[in-house]
Amino acid sequence: RSATALSDPAGLEMVDQPLSEAVQPGQGNAAGGDASFQWLTAAVELVQAGRCHSLVTAPIAKSLWHAANHRYPGQTERLAELTGSPNASMLFTARSPQSGWRLNTLLATTHIPLAAVPQHLNGALVQRKLDKLLAFCQRFNPAPHLVVAGLNPHAGEAGRLGAEESTWLEAALDAWRRQHPEVQLEGPLPPDTCWL
């Protein structure tokens, strides 16, 4: 049912943005990267002007943005700049059409190599992200159930597969729990099974 609704163009206005030069579909180049960048910018301007009510994006080819001299790690950072939101976060949300159950996933880091993730994570960052996730979730449920995934497989297996959970993540979550005793917070849970 939802696939039909999404594919039905009735009531949808398609806004075309001209290209500065021709691009070949399926052939990545700087012109295509620039077009992608300009389209995102124009889409945000349309929403900000009230001509559109929402913005949905797809993944972009960051290498092509860079080829066109647009030096952003990703579109999240460009969206943050355009909207004056320096502390923006990337959040994915889904709701089951059958049960109404909602899953909201907020990322602690974005657009960095996996090897760099441990150096970017710390207790203060995780607590700030939990504050953002709580504020978002409370828009739909005044008493949300929050879960934090561990960084390592099996949430570190008590230090056998990594120490981040035991050296700082557990303490950060305990401190956040003390500040928010009304919130049900679980974690760090094994990231390989916390989605089940």
Indicate where each model-derived feature is located:
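Anion-binding alpha/beta catalytic cores of soluble intermediary-metabolism enzymes, centered on
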Residues: 1-196
